[in-house]
Amino acid sequence: LHPRVRRQRQMCIRDSVRPNMIFAVAFDYSPLDRAQKKQVLDIATKELLTPKGLRTLSPKSGGYNPNYVGPQIQRDYAYHQGTAWPWLMGFYMEAYLRIYKMSGLSFIERQLIGLEDELTIHCISSLPELFDGNPPFKGRGAVSFAMNVAEVLRILKLLSKYY
């Protein structure tokens, strides 16, 4: 990445921290070198990671709204401004394993616990559409969201390759 594209203070892409950046680390082919991938992962871990998924916007960014509540227009705004999406956790975990390999397994397993706990709360063996971006990370939106369940299953399959 060209230096002028990076924020000097945090060394991240453009001016807000969003989960899109994790795809550049998770995919097989990336324009980033290993050091850049680790920087992206470190920022995502520090600013976006929750026990229920990745936030759609860092709490340090302007316009952060972690609570999916209120009238439809207010919920629509919060949807991309700080709520946590479980399906993004799959790509985050894949990125984490690309950087840390076997030494990252215990961390990934601990992260899955936050999602595993939810499988009996809203809809048996399913996960809600999203969670509030701040504690207590309340499940919101659709009570059962296939994309979230699919990503957890994909990560479990990926983890099985290590055992």
Predicted regions and their residues:
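Non-catalytic carbohydrate-binding regions of carbohydrate-active enzymes
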Residues: 7-10, 32-152, 159-163
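Short, solvent-exposed loop/turn segments at the edges of secondary structure
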Residues: 6, 17-22, 87-88
